[in-house]
From Swiss-Prot:
<dbReference type="GO" id="GO:0002949">
    <property type="term" value="P:tRNA threonylcarbamoyladenosine modification"/>
</dbReference>
<comment type="similarity">
    <text>Belongs to the KAE1 / TsaD family.</text>
</comment>
<comment type="function">
    <text>Required for the formation of a threonylcarbamoyl group on adenosine at position 37 (t(6)A37) in tRNAs that read codons beginning with adenine. Is involved in the transfer of the threonylcarbamoyl moiety of threonylcarbamoyl-AMP (TC-AMP) to the N6 group of A37, together with TsaE and TsaB. TsaD likely plays a direct catalytic role in this reaction.</text>
</comment>
<keyword id="KW-0963">Cytoplasm</keyword>
<feature type="binding site">
    <location>
        <position position="172"/>
    </location>
    <ligand>
        <name>substrate</name>
    </ligand>
</feature>
<dbReference type="InterPro" id="IPR043129">
    <property type="entry name" value="ATPase_NBD"/>
</dbReference>
<dbReference type="GO" id="GO:0061711">
    <property type="term" value="F:N(6)-L-threonylcarbamoyladenine synthase activity"/>
</dbReference>
<dbReference type="InterPro" id="IPR022450">
    <property type="entry name" value="TsaD"/>
</dbReference>
<feature type="binding site">
    <location>
        <position position="121"/>
    </location>
    <ligand>
        <name>Fe cation</name>
    </ligand>
</feature>
<keyword id="KW-0408">Iron</keyword>
<dbReference type="GO" id="GO:0005506">
    <property type="term" value="F:iron ion binding"/>
</dbReference>
<keyword id="KW-0808">Transferase</keyword>
<keyword id="KW-0479">Metal-binding</keyword>
<dbReference type="InterPro" id="IPR017861">
    <property type="entry name" value="KAE1/TsaD"/>
</dbReference>
<dbReference type="GO" id="GO:0005737">
    <property type="term" value="C:cytoplasm"/>
</dbReference>
<keyword id="KW-0012">Acyltransferase</keyword>
<dbReference type="Pfam" id="PF00814">
    <property type="entry name" value="TsaD"/>
</dbReference>
């Protein structure tokens, strides 16, 4: 019997403030992963500056492409495809990765695969262990908070979404109020473990009969509480503030997700995105799902695969490769790209 050929994909990720390249074999094995972070450059601004992000991508993308190939000990001739995030994200940042991937595809003749950034985060799970379908994914990051149902690796639908702010965005905004440098999530998580939920911040939409989220009211309640305390000269405990904020976020995410698991009965539950690195959220999701009568397999990617990285793009691209979904050199950035919603799903 003929031995199955390994499929190696060189992937690019540049949708926001991380420039990353990776070589992924068979959609599940990371042969190399290089991430050039820009956190220090953006921290003084309190958030990502698109023009600064694009300039940094330009400066490092050639070098980290070379590093990814060297780390994987492969040449261009060993590759089977080139993959790149083409949305959603910052348009200028996306274009740097897209143009690099197009140039590589044109120079080598290798097929080009465009990858949805959100599907990349979800596909990070298959770098940990095989995903059994149907699967349910909670994607929670600075730009998105969504619950997605996956019927197979390339067919999916959104069953719940945020109506306003994403959870990660709320973390960063209240971090500014607390004087925490961008990105604020890790510090707030650490503080939350040292405090108590004493402020009773709102859990918006937690009892509504849907899987949507809203975090703008929570953010406003937090800011108003802090401003009122400042006006009357009251000093609030930062650990209790962090614990109260995080409890409100985690309560809603856990309640909605567990309810969706009960309805859709997935074989696997996946959590992805930068906020998936939050230890309080990981602990709560593991506890809630383990208590279910019919619990799915739970895959929580390691912390290094929760943030933006090219390995997850390579994993998602492998699924597209097997399905024959290739792009041509007209591939363009789609900064507002969205996964299909349930009512639009075919």
């Amino acid at each position: 019997m003929k031995e199955k050929k390994d499929i190696r994909i060189l992937a690019f990720e540049s949708s926001c403030d991380e420039t990353s390249t990776a070589v992924v074999k068979n959609g599940s094995e990371i042969e190399s992963l290089v991430v050039a972070t820009q956190i220090k450059s953006h921290a003084r601004f309190g958030g990502v500056v698109p023009e600064v992000a694009s300039r940094h991508h330009i400066e490092v993308i050639t070098q980290i492409t070379r590093e990814a190939l060297e780390e994987a000990k492969v040449s261009w001739e060993d590759l089977d495809a080139i993959a790149v995030t083409h949305g959603p994200g910052l348009v200028g940042a996306l274009l740097i990765g897209i143009n690099a991937a197009k140039a590589a595809s044109m120079a080598t003749g290798l097929p080009l695969i465009g990858v949805d950034h959100i599907m990349g985060h979800i596909s990070a799970a298959q770098l940990v262990e095989p995903v059994e379908y149907p699967a349910l994914a909670l994607q929670v990051s600075g730009g998105h908070t969504e619950i997605a149902l996956l019927k197979d690796p390339t067919h999916f639908e959104i069953v719940g979404d945020t109506r306003d702010d994403a959870a990660g965005e709320a973390y960063d905004k209240i971090g500014r109020v607390l004087g925490v440098n961008y990105p604020a999530g890790k510090t707030i998580d650490q503080w939350a473990h040292q405090g108590k939920d004493t402020f009773g911040f709102p859990r918006a939409m937690i009892d509504e009969d849907n899987y949507d989220f809203s975090f703008s009211g929570l953010k406003s309640a937090f800011i108003n509480t802090c401003h009122h305390a400042d006006q009357i000269g009251e000093k609030l405990d930062k650990y209790d503030l962090a614990a109260s904020f995080q409890a409100a976020v985690v309560d809603v995410l856990a309640e909605k997700t567990v309810r969706a698991i009960r309805q859709y009965q997935p074989k696997t539950f996946i959590m992805g995105g930068g906020v998936a690195a939050n230890l309080g959220l990981r602990e709560r999701m593991n506890k809630e799902i383990a208590a279910l009568e019919k619990a799915p397999k739970v895959i929580l990617p390691p912390l290094k695969l929760c943030g933006d990285n090219a390995a997850m793009i390579g994993a998602a691209a492998y699924n597209q490769y097997l399905a024959g979904n290739f792009a041509d050199l007209t591939l363009d950035a789609d900064p507002s790209m969205e996964l299909p919603y349930a009512e639009d799903y075919k």
